[in-house]
Amino acid sequence: MQLFLVRHALPLRSEPGQGADPDLSEEGRAQVARLPEALARFPITRVVSSPQRRAIQTAEPVAAARGLTVEIDDRFAEYDRDLPVYIPIEQIRDENPQEWARMAQGHLPSSVDEDAFRARVRAVVDNVATTAEHEDTVAVFSHGGVINVVLHEILGTRRVLSFPIDYVSVTRLLFSRSGQASVVTVNGTEHVWDLLPRNQR
């Protein structure tokens, strides 16, 4: 089974009290517009998404291009889902330097129950792998923290947040018939390189 882990596109910022579930920004929608063509050569048979809007809105064009429905699985939600506000990672450095430093060192935010989060992510990936046929290609639309946890579990990295996972990046995994996972590519961004915030300075 082939599994694509796609991070959501650039979302709007939410304000305190609005929750951590914003829609995509205009820039994010431009990023998403490139995904169907970028993934066209792969025989995607199933599209699964986090319940958060920024992930669903990233998944929808890919599913529509194949006549598939977007399946929602709460377990693919990011660690921030219950927070009162969403702040894009690029802004955290200036607004919360202490939390930024913690994340830059590879740790989840201080408010996150790491064991519970890792267990949730591990369970949903195991479920996707065990319910898929060997020939299936599944595209999961999720979040940077979730994707890092998956890679951490497979590769045994020293830190949970070991990889930079860009907006609309594609991480590709393969699962053997026995369920053994291997990492093929991480954070593929060729299709949106020029639209990423870090490349527009």
Locations of regions flagged by a protein language model:
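Generic beta-sheet signal
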Residues: 3, 136-142
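Short active-site segment of divalent metal-dependent hydrolases/proteases
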Residues: 11, 146-147
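Generic structural signal for well-ordered alpha-helical scaffold segments
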Residues: 33-40, 118, 122-130, 151
